[in-house]
Amino acid sequence: MRWQSFGSVITTTILDKLSVLLLCVCLLCASANAQSACCAQITATQYESLEPGARALLSEIGIGAANFALTIDAINQQTQARLLEGEMDHLVFFALQSRRFTSRAAIEPALSAYQLVAQLTPEEKARCLNTENQPPPCQIVSARIPEAEAARLREFAQVLRQKSDDERIQYFQNLPALRNLSDRKIYERVSAEYLRAMTFLYRKEFAAKSFLHDQEAAAYVAALYQQRGHSTDTQVEAGFAIHEGLAAVSARLTAEKSEGLLLDNVLIIGPGMDFAPRTDLLDWVPPQSYQPFAVADSLLKLKLVAPDRLRLDCVDINPRVVDFLNNFARRNDRKLALVSGLADRTERPLSAGYKNYFTQLGLSIGQPESLRLPIDLRAHSAKLLRVEAAIAGRIHARQMNVVTQRCVNAAPYDLVIVTNVFPYFSSAELALALNNIAAMLREGGLLLHNESRPELASLAQAAGVPAIQSRTVLIAGAQKNSLFDGVAIHQKTRIATSVIPGSASGR
């Protein structure tokens, strides 16, 4: 995920044959006392299960009992297409930036997008880059691809036909859309994906700046993300705002003198994976997922859960994220390379709060070790974390689409965490997701997220999980060029004055 401001879209994706990989679920139960595997049962969302307020909101956009099943089917089909598109985005970003297959200079994708569009005539720009909220398809002939980019793409197309020991390259080689194609056909497909990805980047990074008002620009970018491919991008920084949100919960529990550790049954939706991000690709580090481990660390550090009671389930639409998390506890070497995506520089120093968070990160779940960085990354904070087997064995994952599905467990969740997932959803999809989340939470359970879309508050209220608190956190910067993230806390309750988990859980 790329950091900009609270609620900014940053980005979690899949192959186009999901059913083959649905068998790769919940294979991990590492300790004798470990709870049952993630999501004992997954069910499709039914119209009758929606809250009355949610039904009313959906009816305003033409979704009712008669066409609900068709709507769910359409969303599932669109999700599969967007997952494949997101994987192709990762492929393009890897091809432009990686040094694992070429000695050519890395190319920053946003800069490449700008150079590509700079070649267009005014008529082409008007057709391809208009600033309506629903941009039309744009076709740019491959001959327009700048030579430096074309050279990298050609070399990458050849590499995809060769044996490789690089984990990311191996993954791209096995994408069904590219498998068994000739070098020429692979180059043609990769070029087409490059043009599509660059068009989106230009719209987001440059066309959006043509608006006079921030609200109009935000609406334009939001519309772009509701159509783009699903990304698994994530960074270590993502955990900071969630930690601060959990700290607020802990402080309130202390102030209320609440007894018991009530946040031991946790669900993370879309934990993501650092695979091939749009910027700052670290291809010398294997693909990793950080968030489940960071959340476990925060819960234990803040004494919101006892180590022997922790259950941390994860659901993601991308099977490679699920596979990583389910296989992690089996590894002989359970290490995570934690590298901050932000450099600590004079012109934009890391905040004291974030630096303290990174220093303490992982101390409650494992043993930190030193990590030597390349010279050009020495201004970044980094460490190697060896995760304890007992903790790794309490993290489970399963493939699921929270818009159209929900988990059914013997005990509902105490806490659900969602970061940088909601921006990809339309209003209808967001309403459905919030209803599914509410159904998976116990009465008094909490939802933490970092989406700032204004309509979310009313949609969450209609789903029965009203907002109770929000806060903004400074990650880096001083008075100018500052970098923020934020967290909102919601609670499933029928009593407006109840703002902290209590006896309603029946525990």
Model-derived segments and their meaning:
Residues 13-30:
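Bacterial N-terminal signal peptides
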Residues 45, 49, 55-66, 70-217, ...:
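Class I S-adenosyl-L-methionine-dependent methyltransferase module
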Residues 197-263, 281-285:
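Class I SAM-dependent methyltransferase Rossmann-like catalytic core
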Residues 346, 458-490:
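Conserved Class I S-adenosyl-L-methionine
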Residues 404-416:
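A short acidic, Gly/Pro-enriched loop at the edge of an enzyme's catalytic core
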Residues 414-428:
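A short SAM/SAH-binding and catalytic strip from SAM-dependent methyltransferases
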Residues 431-443:
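A short glycine-rich, Lys/Arg-flanked "PGG" loop and its adjoining helix->strand segment in the class I
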Residues 443-452:
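Conserved beta-strand signature within the Rossmann-like core of class I S-adenosyl-L-methionine
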